[in-house]
A protein has these predicted regions:
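Conserved, well-structured beta-alpha core segment at the onset of a catalytic domain
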Residues: 1-4, 107-109, 118-145, 150-195
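Extracellular S/T/G-rich loop segment that most often corresponds to the catalytic His/Ser-adjacent loop
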Residues: 12, 16-19, 25-32, 154-255, ...
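Ser/Thr/Pro-rich, low-complexity mucin-like regions
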Residues: 88, 99, 257-281
């Protein structure tokens, strides 16, 4: 609070290759002293320019508040920070670096992840990335992840086939608002032992067919195809990758990427299968190979299928050991003294996974959360309050998302481990689940949890009491 010392132990900017890289790695730059951190100021402007996501999240998890009322949950915790490349191996490198650094200091490690993707391997908890996460969890690392912000986005279809077909419109993100937009990425996962086929149709604004690709089967298609559909003087480009049986789960899968058409054409996904169930997701993709917000599958009339917002949890929140966090509005008192808030966030992604595993695990406040902003950001925001320090102004502002609810839980996990450092990640997760609270918004939740709320709302006080082994009656004001 006095701003006398930094609590950031080290940071690894994987985008900056001037070095020095961390020991054992050949890329990125590590900052391991207060002087290095101060001189660096911020991470490299990368695919998101100079953002403020990480600063806001860190402030929620454990910010000191800098003399304001906006103090984080575990406000005496220390930090390791990584800006990682969009690559599975880079993510695992970041985890390994964090674990080694924490082990060297004799500290427990909580990894908070406020990112999510739908194309980084299988999203059923069985991918190699999820297996790596589970392995680190078995070594004592606790992982907390945001559930995602695709609630209300009808970007998913679950289709049961019996020698029939599926037609649905692939809606595209507005290309005039994002210079790095590439198009849409449709991800499809089928039933183990089955096969399915995909392709596209191109319609004009009157829904008349003007072009069409062939069907590509997961059973016979080579790993990668680059192709196009010619429509008059225009061309609709697409590419496709397939697996007959994905190595980690045995499921047939296809990733169909369609570049946004230059004209006013409508692109339709066509798919067919002799039997089995196939899940489809329609996700925006940028030129940098990222993008995690869904766009709707919609109907164009008879014979078409519209999407839904179910099964919206991506990687890494789908991992079995991870604590996946949904969002809701925090309670507050109105000027008249009435208790308000508590409703679920309409943007919070819902479960379950495609193998029916229950996710999310828990929910926490994630709407209009006030926290610290990066003083280097070029993002637009409304300042709530500011602190001047060393001739620089540091703002606090409100943001919403499961990126805000996840660090709340990460901070609670840090408090739990501070109370009882001997707990395993599985025990920590169990404490959070068993002490979760219900209210008039959640209703009575089933023992197995709920696809919107998980096992309920986080109860920090009771969770820490349980970690301490304290037995007693606790009255929590809803």
């Amino acid at each position: 609070t006095l701003l006398a010392n930094t609590r950031i132990i080290a940071a690894w900017d994987q985008f900056k290759n001037s070095g020095p890289a961390p020991a054992g790695y050949s890329y990125g730059t590590e900052y391991s002293t207060p002087t290095d951190l101060i001189n660096a100021g911020a991470d490299t402007a990368n695919i998101y320019s100079y953002a403020t996501h990480g600063s806001h999240v860190a402030g929620i998890a454990g910010g000191s508040g800098a003399g304001t009322e906006f103090r984080g949950i575990a406000f005496e915790s220390e930090f390791l920070i990584t800006t990682f490349l969009v690559d599975e191996s880079a993510v695992i490198d970041a985890w390994e670096w964090m674990k080694n650094t924490a082990d060297a200091q004799g500290k427990r490690l909580v990894v908070n992840m406020i990112w999510g993707l739908y194309h980084m391997q299988a999203i059923d908890g069985n991918s190699l990335l999820s297996q790596a996460l589970d392995n680190y969890s078995s070594q004592g690392v606790v992982f907390v992840t945001s559930a995602g912000n695709n609630g209300g986005e009808n970007f998913h279809i679950k289709q049961d086939f019996a020698n029939d077909s599926l037609l649905t419109r692939i809606n595209f993100y507005n290309s005039t608002t994002l210079s790095t937009l590439w198009g849409q990425s449709v991800h499809a996962w089928g039933t183990p032992g089955e096969e399915f086929s995909v392709g596209i149709k191109v319609l004009n604004t009157s829904n008349v067919l003007v072009g069409e690709s062939q069907y590509y089967s997961t059973a016979t298609t080579v790993n990668y195809i680059d192709s196009f559909v010619v429509v008059g003087t225009d061309t609709v480009f697409f590419n496709l990758s397939c697996d007959a049986a994905y190595p980690t789960n045995g499921r047939p899968q296809a990733r169909l990427r369609v570049k946004r058409p230059s004209g006013s054409y409508r692109v339709v996904l066509k798919s067919q299968a002799p039997s089995g169930t196939v899940h489809y997701w329609n996700v925006t993709e940028l030129t940098s190979d990222v993008g995690n917000w869904g766009m709707p599958f919609s109907s164009l009339g008879s014979g078409y299928t519209a999407g839904n917002d179910s099964n919206g949890i991506g990687t890494p929140a789908c991992s079995n050991s991870a604590i996946s966090v949904a969002a809701y509005a925090a309670n507050f008192y109105t000027a008249g003294g009435t208790l308000a808030g508590g409703a679920p966030a309409n943007f919070s992604s819902t479960g379950p996974l495609m193998n029916d595993t229950l996710k999310p695990d828990i929910s926490a406040p994630g709407i209009q959360v006030t926290s610290s902003m990066s003083s280097y950001t070029d993002a637009a925001y409304t300042t709530i309050t500011s602190v001047d320090f060393n001739s620089r102004t540091y703002d606090f502002a409100r943001l919403s998302g499961t990126s805000m609810s996840s660090p709340v839980v990460a901070g609670v996990v840090a408090l739990i481990l501070n109370a009882n450092p001997t707990l395993t990640p599985a025990q920590v997760k169990d404490i959070i689940i068993q002490t979760a609270r219900e209210d008039s918004h959640t209703g009575v939740l089933p023992p197995e949890g709920d696809v919107n709320w998980g096992h309920g709302k986080i109860n920090a006080y009771l969770a820490v009491q349980t970690a301490l082994g304290v037995v007693g009656t606790v009255e929590i004001e809803q």
